[in-house]
Amino acid sequence: MTQVYNFSAGPAMLPVEVLRRAEQELRNWHGLGTSVMEISHRSKEFMQVAEESEKDLRDLLQIPANYKVLFCHGGARAQFAAVPLNLLGDRNSADYIDGGYWAHSAIKEAQKYCTPNVIDVTTHDNGLTGIQPMKQWKLSDNAAYVHYCPNETIDGVAINEQPDFGNKVVVADYSSSILSRPIDISRYGVIYAGAQKNIGPAGLTLVIVREDLLGKAHTALPSILDYKVLADNDSMFNTPPTFAWYLSGLVFKWLKEQGGLCEMEKRNQAKAELLYGAIDRTGFYRNQVAITNRSWMNVPFQMADASLDKLFLREAEAQGLQALKGHRVAGGMRASIYNAMPIEGVKALTDFMADFERRHG
C-alpha cells in the first residue's frame, strides 16, 4: 500500500502513534469492557482523562496558575461571538487586527455586538502579502481588548511576533498554530483554538482565559459560551465532546514524549524551510507571501501555468499526497504541515514537485 500523507488544513493529520493507541483501546478502554466514548463524562475514569489532559497542556504551554483552561464546543466561530460577549463589559469597542480571512470573519461576527476598530495591517509589496510590525499597529485607547489571528490558514500568512501592548487585553485565535512552538501565555488575556488542526479531532475547542477576565459576560450571552460558567463547572456544564477530549489528551502526551514545544518548533521550521526551498528553487512554483510572514503551518503555492493544477492534484493523490487543493477563496495548492506531519511527508511532496516540474516545466 502506498504511504499516505494528509496535507489537509483541518480536520488534519493526527500522529500515527496516537491513532494506534486509540485503536488498541477503542473497545476495551482501561479494562472497563467499553469504549471511552461510552462512559459518563462525570465518571472517575473520565475525570482522570480531563485532569491529566489539562495538566499535560499546562506543562506544554507553561500556562500560569492564574489562567483557566476550558474544553468547549463550537469551534473558533463560536468564539468569534463568545469573545466580545464575555469581554466587552460596559465598553462598546474593541481593536480588531485585520490580517486575513479568519481575522476578517471574527470582525464580521463582532459587528453584531460592538463597533470594532478595524486595523488593516496587511502590506502588498512586489506582489507579496505581508504584515506590518506590531509597533506600527494603530491601537485605540478605549478598546476593551485587542483581537488578532497569528496564523491565517488560507493565505499562509503568519504573525510571529509576540504581543507587547502594556496592560491591554490581548485575544488571539491560535486555531492553526497552537502547540507548534512555545508562546508566552502571560502576554494574552484569552487564547482560543479549534482542535482540528494541531490539537486533535474536530469537535473540541480550547480556551485559555486569565481569571480576572471572568464574570464580565453580557446578560444575553448563552450560558454554554460563558467563560465563568464553564470555569466554575470544570468544562462540564453540559456533556463535553468526550472522545475528542480524550484523543487530544493523547496528543498532549505524544507531544511531551517527542520533547515538547521546543522540539516541535525545530521540526516545524525544518519542514517549512524544506518546502519553501522547493517552491523558490526555479520559479515554476511560487508563493505570494513575504518571507518574514510565511506560515510554518500552511503553505499555499501556485504554478505559473494554472491549467496544470488539476493534473498536479490528480498525480499527487495517486502518489499518496492527499488534500493539496487550495482553499476555494485562494485556489492553487496548499500544504498544511502541522505537528503530526513528519518530515518524510514533506520530503515526499518536494520530490514529487521536482519530478512534476521536470515533466511539465
Curated annotation (Swiss-Prot):
L-glutamate binds at residue 42. InterPro entries: Aminotrans_V_dom, Aminotrans_V_PyrdxlP_BS, Pser_aminoTfrase, PyrdxlP-dep_Trfase, PyrdxlP-dep_Trfase_major, PyrdxlP-dep_Trfase_small. The keyword Amino-acid biosynthesis applies. Its EC number is 2.6.1.52. Belongs to the class-V pyridoxal-phosphate-dependent aminotransferase family. SerC subfamily. Catalyzes the reversible conversion of 3-phosphohydroxypyruvate to phosphoserine and of 3-hydroxy-2-oxo-4-phosphonooxybutanoate to phosphohydroxythreonine. This is Phosphoserine aminotransferase. The gene is serC.
